[in-house]
A protein has these predicted regions:
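Bacterial N-terminal signal peptides
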Residues: 11-22
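Low-complexity, serine/threonine/proline-enriched polar segments
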Residues: 322-378
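Extended C-terminal subregions enriched in glycine
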Residues: 350, 402-424, 429-438
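Extended, charge-rich low-complexity interaction segments
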Residues: 349-367, 459-481
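Short N-terminal or domain-adjacent regulatory/targeting segments
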Residues: 197, 227-229, 374-391
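Short, conserved helix/loop micro-motifs enriched in His/Cys and acidic residues
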Residues: 391-406
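Flexible, low-complexity junctional segments that flank or bridge functional domains
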Residues: 27-343, 347, 402, 417, ...
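N-terminal secretory signal peptides that target proteins for export/translocation
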Residues: 1-8
């Protein structure tokens, strides 16, 4: 599997998604649901209490020397969640209370994941238009603007300024308000009504367009299939399938909409990397490359790393990443349940015909079991020394042409890992939005609750001295503020920057 030092990150992303799918299938929610308002209140409170207890017992953050405020933050989230739970009257209220608890924790790798069948919930509603955040406000997207003028900017609703409303109606229940990228991905949900009983649905909003201010009375209606298509079209635009195109001579567009590829997409990635490696002499003279990460929900960062090795040269990428992660350690929280999970993971990988992954997982499980036997909180994953290398090949010529990376606001997980790789090189230019951020708590298992309504997110490990610090956001060098994030819009941004770089400009 290449350098053993990469084993943790490689297998974590390559295998754990499939393993987690199998693990999550072990138990399905019961058919019986709480039958009264009192029962829903009791369920919300009980599930939040159990989530806190499970987190205390198994989450690595509880004993993280670099995060002494973890438990205080968890306790504050508990108090807030229980305040909401005490007001719950139905299923939608249960979901909202859990969301409020999670938002107060502020980490997507902690808290509760609701397991209720979405078809049982009331249909979400919308006012007949879609908005997108573009750095300084919400703008009506042209893809769905029938009930409000396209490109109009929201000023306020019901006398409440737009930003204040987004904080109370959106970020109090989802997303992470301190991360700029989350505004780009989450703020638009202001105009999606999920029947949250703790927030008022906007009734009358004011907008501005071309110097004119006007009011709009909102007419809420169920989101149907046509509306869903409009939401999809407005979310980061028209992302392409995995592969490379040449929108104009000598400018190459590389689409990476997923790092969790299916069989056809895996073949497309391999073909792309072969094309870059085999034709590298030609591509050294490219005007620019554009790497498009729109729609990328993470997965296995190996695909980005392999592309980078083909483009910049394997030895350069490997050396840059080795320096970036030279101090990184991986600490596995050695609780009995975490240890059992990693041991199960090893058996599951064996069953899937992944012997290298199974061996790696088994080593971690054995280390966790040994730590338990010694009363230690963590098993620290051992870094294997580099294997004896073959004599180095002559270095390939450096790739020095501009590489523009289109970053969506919800870029996280393996998408952030890709930015870790690409930004090792000074010819990389990030365009689009600020990214999201990750905590250092990873490899999440799900602890299903007896209620069947939710599962606790339990990371099994944490990074110490990671090259990218906890909660670090990648800022775009060029913000793309047009409401429409189409390929044409993004190409205009790239061409403008290329023109600026011309001698004499």
């Amino acid at each position: 599997m290449g350098n053993p030092r990469c084993m943790s990150s490689l297998f974590a992303s390559l295998f754990l998604a499939a393993v987690m799918t199998a693990a999550g299938a072990h138990a399905a929610p019961p058919s019986g649901l709480p039958a009264s308002a009192a029962a829903w209140r009791a369920a919300a409170a009980a599930d939040i209490e159990v989530a806190v207890q499970v987190t205390r017992e198994h989450h690595p953050g509880v004993h993280d020397p670099n995060n002494p405020a973890f438990l205080a933050n968890l306790d504050a989230a508990r108090r807030h969640g229980l305040q909401l739970a005490a007001q719950v009257e139905d299923m939608a209220g249960y979901v909202a209370a859990v969301d409020g608890f999670n938002a107060r924790i502020g980490d997507g790798h902690a808290g509760l994941a609701v397991r209720i069948d979405k078809t049982l919930l009331p249909k979400p509603r919308w006012p007949g238009f879609v908005t997108v955040w573009r750095g300084d406000g919400l703008y009506v997207h042209p893809a769905a603007s029938g009930a409000a003028p396209a490109r109009a900017r929201l000023l306020a609703c019901d006398g409440k300024p737009a930003e204040e409303l987004i904080r109370t109606n959106v970020f109090a229940f989802q997303g992470r308000v301190a991360e700029p990228g989350q505004w780009w991905s989450e703020a638009r949900k202001l105009f999606v009504d999920t029947h949250n009983p703790f927030i008022p649905r906007p009734r009358r909003c004011s907008f501005t367009l071309d110097g004119r201010t006007f009011d709009q009375v909102l007419a809420w209606r169920d989101i149907d299939s046509a509306a869903e298509r409009q939401f999809a079209a407005s979310s980061d635009g028209d992302a392409r399938g995995v592969g490379m195109t040449e929108p104009r001579k000598n400018l190459y567009w590389v689409a990476m909409p997923t790092f969790h590829p299916n069989e056809a997409e895996r073949a497309a990635y391999r073909a792309l990397n072969r094309e870059i490696a085999d034709g590298r002499a030609h591509y050294l003279a490219a005007d620019a490359f554009v790497v498009d990460l729109r729609k990328n929900g993470g997965g296995n960062s190996m695909w980005a790393r392999d592309f980078a090795r083909a483009l910049w040269g394997a030895s350069r990428v490997d050396a840059a990443l080795a320096a970036f992660s030279a101090r990184t350690e991986v600490w596995w929280r050695a609780s009995p349940a975490n240890t059992d999970y990693v041991a199960w993971m090893a058996a599951e990988l064996d069953r899937q015909g992944q012997p290298d992954g199974a061996a790696w997982a088994r080593t971690q499980a054995e280390g966790m079991r040994a730590a338990l036997g010694h009363g230690e909180l963590f098993h620290v994953e051992r870094k294997e020394p580099d294997a004896a290398a073959a004599p180095p090949a002559a270095p390939v010529p450096a790739f020095e042409r501009p590489v523009y990376v289109v970053v969506p606001g919800d870029c996280a997980s393996a998408c952030l890992d890709a930015l870790d790789v690409f930004t090792r090189f000074p010819n990389t230019v990030l365009i689009g939005a600020p990214s999201s951020a990750d905590s250092t708590y990873m490899e999440v298992r799900r602890h299903n609750l007896a209620s069947g309504l939710a599962a606790v997110r339990v990371p099994n490990k944490m990074y110490v001295h990671r090259g990218r610090p906890d909660r670090q956001v990648y800022q775009a060098a060029i913000l793309v503020t047009d409401p429409v994030w189409s390929v044409d819009t993004l190409l205009k941004v790239v061409e403008s920057d290329l023109a600026r770089r011309q001698p004499g400009r």
